[in-house]
Regions:
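PLD/PLD-like phosphodiesterase catalytic module centered on the HKD motif
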Residues: 1-30, 37-164
């Protein structure tokens, strides 16, 4: 399938929620997500949380990769609660802000189901332009990029915070 272009913040957020619902329906074992802060993702949206809850099960893993999670903790309290409850299937890592990300997508969501892969990429956050693709080659290249970046990251966004 050829990549389908999209434009607009609302369209990007709609496609994110639809891709999460698709991943749940397809029984995807892994979901990979990249964004500098995830602040513009509809993580506390009821439909997104329902899709994630439906998806989260034995043997499932959500890999989050960001530069920081402070914005998520401040703006997406419902997702933070979900993260706490489903910590067993979430791995969150952070890359150093100084790390060069030349050519990196602004946002990336990857999943593979029985019907094949889905790759959702946002290239321009200013104009909210991106593409969604079912191309296996695009997914492989994006996953290799994600894995290379994850190797230069550290654990972050713990499911619970311990206080004194």
């Amino acid at each position: 399938m050829n990549a389908q272009k999209f434009e607009g913040r609302a369209e990007f957020q709609r496609l994110l929620v639809e891709t999460l619902a698709w991943a749940a329906a397809q029984g995807c074992r892994e979901i990979h997500a990249w964004d500098a802060s995830f602040v513009d993702w509809p993580l506390s949206d009821a439909n997104a949380l329902t899709a994630l809850t439906t998806w989260a099960g034995h043997g499932r893993q959500l890999y989050l990769l960001a530069q920081q999670y402070e914005d998520v903790q401040r703006r997406h309290t419902r997702f933070v609660r979900w993260r706490r409850d489903f910590g067993h299937c979430v791995t969150a890592r952070a890359v150093e802000p100084e790390l060069k990300l030349d050519g990196a997508p602004e946002s990336l969501l990857l999943a593979v189901g029985a019907d094949g892969p889905v790759v959702l990429r946002l290239f321009d956050r200013h104009l909210w332009r991106g593409e969604i693709s079912r191309d296996a080659g695009a997914r492989l290249r994006a996953l290799e990029w994600f894995d290379a970046l994850a190797q230069r990251s550290s654990e972050s966004f713990a499911p619970t915070t311990l206080g004194l």
